[in-house]
From Swiss-Prot:
Tissues showing expression: Expressed in the adult bone marrow population that is enriched in hematopoietic stem cells.
Cross-link Glycyl lysine isopeptide (Lys-Gly) (interchain with G-Cter in SUMO2) placement: 91, 177, 248, 262, 270
Functional note: May be required to maintain the proliferative capacity of stem cells. Stabilizes MDM2 by preventing its ubiquitination, and hence proteasomal degradation.
Main location: nucleus
Name assigned to this protein: Guanine nucleotide-binding protein-like 3
Chain positions found as Phosphoserine: 95, 101, 493, 505, 518
Coiled coil: 54-95
Residue ranges with Basic residues bias: 1-45, 114-126
């Protein structure tokens, strides 16, 4: 800990420095005088008043005098009101017992207001569930957008089961962010997912402009390969063929966990910035209907709500909450525990680490993240790791399962029904072309990640558990006390434990145990509440 500054700095300085400052001040004042002389002196304009030639001069003067008197009376009245308010506050100073009763009465009167405010403000998670149900009911085809870096972890069995039970609806998987995984891994995942559902390789465009500025700056835009959309033609062909087979206008719903790129897929299909996109999770709060053409309409939806019964890694990657709510050290440590250590060291250019706390310390020193006093800011390093892993720049990948085992809500008959009506051979050719066009990540930007499997979500708003206001306040007070007791201890407890043991010397092993005398003194003090110095020290 840095020692506090007990003395103020001395104002003594060398004569050279003092004369230099005085000279600069004189020069500055001289320049100001020179500029003021150039501008000239302007006399303030006096109010000429009401001219004698003006009609109703006396009436105007009387009105002005009346307004002046009214302002004076208003000031006097405000002064009296302030004095009365101060007098009332002095009389309210009563005994502590009466004050306690006043506080209780005030709390009782505030209780109906709290209930009314709570009833008026609905839980946003429940609103998300309601909007998701609306999107599924209104859709003929449901596009489940998956992150190609962890496709299995982005699948929600509850949503897929709801689509299957609806009867005539189709479900299509969209592997977005396909440029962030190696091509071999992408092909393996495509073969695995195609056994269940039609899967489209996709890479959303990042070169879209706003509607108003798109036409103006169209000629100046130079499209790079990383900004070009891949898989748009395959998805358009799939939707168009299904619309022709139905013979009617269709609606396509887009669902998925936060930050998988649902709105980016819609913007890429429309070739305009229609839906709001960004780095933050959960930007889309309600369903948004976007017409793609005369026959096809696409519906954007809010993100899926993850169930709290999932693994810590899934909660860290797919919770639509800020990093402060998730606790940065816990979230980043859970992610780091599933990543390959050697590739993490190569990506972040840090030495080998023993545990997550050691890694965050080295990363903070490497990136120049320091607290007051020069100690490494471990929490900022954890936030940096979390933002990179939940963003769209880091290239990590997972291996698909060795063999395909259908889940409880899926079997071969359902898979055949979902594939019916689509030209799968043409889809396979389009996917192969998209993989060939894509440019995979660099070798130093590839990190092997162990997926935690399917991620459970919440579709029914009744399953969302709400905390009472009293529990929330108690929780906040407990957190404040924890933070006050010691930030360092809290940080160490949040991180995964170190799997390292060392032998203690006899002196160290007995250092933590209280001596017999001290324990006897503690027992005596506990038995007798009245503390007598004469018996203990004389």
């Amino acid at each position: 800990m840095k020692r506090p500054k007990l003395k103020k700095a001395s104002k003594r300085m060398t004569c050279h420095k003092r004369y230099k400052i005085q000279k600069k001040v004189r020069e500055h004042h001289r320049k100001l005088r020179k500029e003021a002389k150039k501008r000239g002196h302007k006399k303030p304009r006096k109010d000429p008043g009401v001219p004698n030639s003006a009609p109703f001069k006396e009436a105007l003067l009387r009105e002005a005098e009346l307004r002046k008197q009214q302002l004076e009376e208003l000031k006097q009245q405000q002064k009296l009101d302030r004095q009365k308010e101060q007098e009332r506050k002095r009389k309210l100073e009563v005994s502590p017992g009466d004050e306690q009763s006043n506080v209780e009465t005030r709390e009782e009167s505030d209780e109906p207001k709290r209930k009314k405010a709570k009833a008026g403000k609905q839980n946003p998670k429940k609103l998300h569930c309601q909007e998701l149900k609306k999107v599924i009911e209104a859709s003929d085809i449901v596009l489940e957008v998956l992150d190609a870096r962890d496709p299995l972890g982005c699948r929600c069995p509850q949503i897929e089961e709801a689509v299957i039970q609806s009867g005539s609806k189709k479900l299509i998987l969209v592997l977005n962010k396909s440029d962030l995984v190696p091509k071999e891994n992408l092909e393996n995942w495509l073969n695995y997912l195609n056994k269940e559902l039609p899967t489209v390789v996709f890479k959303a465009s990042t070169n879209l402009k706003n509607r108003k500025t798109f036409k103006i700056k169209k000629k100046k835009v130079v499209p790079f390969q990383s900004k070009i959309c891949c898989g748009k033609e395959a998805l358009w062909k799939l939707l168009g063929d299904f619309q022709q087979s139905c013979g009617k206008d269709i609606q396509v719903g887009v669902i998925g966990f936060p930050n998988v790129g649902k709105s980016s897929v819609i913007n890429s299909l429309k070739q305009e910035w229609i839906c709001n996109v960004g780095i933050s999770m959960g930007l889309t709060r309600s369903m948004q209907i976007v017409p793609l053409d005369k026959q096809i309409t696409i519906i954007d939806s809010p993100c899926l709500i993850i169930s709290p019964c999932n693994s810590p890694t899934a909660l860290a990657l797919r919770s639509p909450a800020s990093i402060e709510e998730l606790r940065p050290l816990e979230a980043a440590s859970a992610i780091l525990s599933q990543a390959d250590n050697e590739q993490v060291v190569l990506k972040y250019t840090v030495p080998e680490y023993k545990d997550s706390l050691h890694f965050f310390t080295k990363l903070a020193q490497r990136r120049g993240l320091h607290q007051k006093g020069g100690s490494p800011n471990v929490e900022s390093a954890a936030k940096l790791v979390w933002s990179e892993w939940t963003g769209a720049s880091l290239g990590y990948y997972c291996h698909p399962p060795a063999s395909w085992n259908h889940s409880l809500h899926f079997n071969e008959n359902i898979a055949a029904v979902m594939k019916k009506g689509f030209n799968l051979e043409e889809l396979e050719k389009n996917n192969a072309h998209s993989i060939q066009v894509l440019k995979g990540p660099h070798l130093t930007n590839r990190i092997l990640f162990r997926s935690s499997g399917l991620t459970n979500g919440i579709l029914d708003e009744k399953d969302i558990v709400e905390e009472s206001p009293r529990q929330t306040e108690d929780k906040q007070d407990a957190d404040d006390q924890e933070n006050g007791s010691g930030e360092r201890n809290a940080e160490i407890s949040d991180v995964a434990p170190v799997e390292e043991t060392r032998e203690l010397s006899p002196e160290q092993s007995t250092a933590g145990k209280p001596s017999d005398g001290s324990s006897a003194l503690d027992r005596a003090s506990q038995e007798d509440e009245t503390y007598d110095f004469t018996t203990d020290y004389i």
